[in-house]
Swiss-Prot record:
Organism per entry: Sulfurimonas denitrificans (strain ATCC 33889 / DSM 1251) (Thiomicrospira denitrificans (strain ATCC 33889 / DSM 1251))
Subcellular compartments: Cytoplasm
Domain notes: The PRC barrel domain binds ribosomal protein uS19.
SUPFAM superfamilies per UniProt: PRC-barrel domain, Translation proteins
Description of how the protein assembles with itself and partners: Binds ribosomal protein uS19.
Residues of the PRC barrel domain: 96-175
Principal location listed in the UniProt entry: cytoplasm
Single GO BP term: ribosomal small subunit biogenesis
Protein name: Ribosome maturation factor RimM
Gene expressing this chain: rimM
Family recorded in the similarity comment: Belongs to the RimM family.
Length: 179
């Protein structure tokens, strides 16, 4: 198993206790709510897991095995739920031209054959996803910003090649120059 597939992905945060049966509010941070199913376990740290005993997607409520009272449930308030990259690839289905963010991170951003930088992370602002790019060192030495944002959509993104870890863009140099 590769080092990357051992990485835990933050997919939700447990909210406040609701009612008398140990139910809790669920704040999903993922585009894949279908991964929250009865009987599925999630990490709360590298060594501890919680297993869902019930979920109500309409009300965004969850309940965990062994947490049957408000007092028990309150111990979990504000805990993050994590899953693995391996499980995400197995359980979550992508449409054509959709990518997991962890596959985008680390890609080179290239315009007109020139590497502008490396994708450090993605950030969602409103309905648009942005590539947070760490600028190539040679460009930084030439006076450009150390990092910049590129909208991850047309017309800026021409091609995304996950296997080669290259995202071909247009207009990103203009964005970098204005940063």
């Amino acid at each position: 198993m590769s080092k990357q597939s051992n990485k835990l992905l933050h997919i939700a945060t447990i909210g406040k206790s609701v009612g008398l049966g140990g139910d809790m509010k669920l704040h999903i941070k993922s585009d894949f709510p279908e991964q929250f199913k009865k009987g599925v376990s999630f990490f709360i740290n590298e060594n501890e897991t919680l297993t869902l005993s019930d979920i109500n997607h309409e009300r965004a409520l969850i309940k965990f095995v062994g947490y049957n009272s408000p007092e028990d449930a309150k111990k979990l308030t504000n805990k993050n739920l994590y899953t693995t990259i391996e499980r995400t690839r197995k359980e979550c289905r992508l449409e054509k031209d959709e990518y997991f963010w962890f596959d985008i991170e680390g890609c080179s951003v290239v315009e007109d054959g020139k590497v502008l930088g490396i994708v450090d992370e993605l950030d969602r602002m409103g309905i648009t996803n942005y590539l947070c790019v760490i600028t190539d060192e040679t460009l930084v030495k030439s006076g450009f910003a150390k990092s910049f944002l590129i909208p991850f959509r047309e017309p800026f993104t021409i091609n995304t090649d996950i296997k080669e870890k290259i995202i071909t863009v247009i207009g990103a140099m203009d964005i970098l120059e204005a940063s």
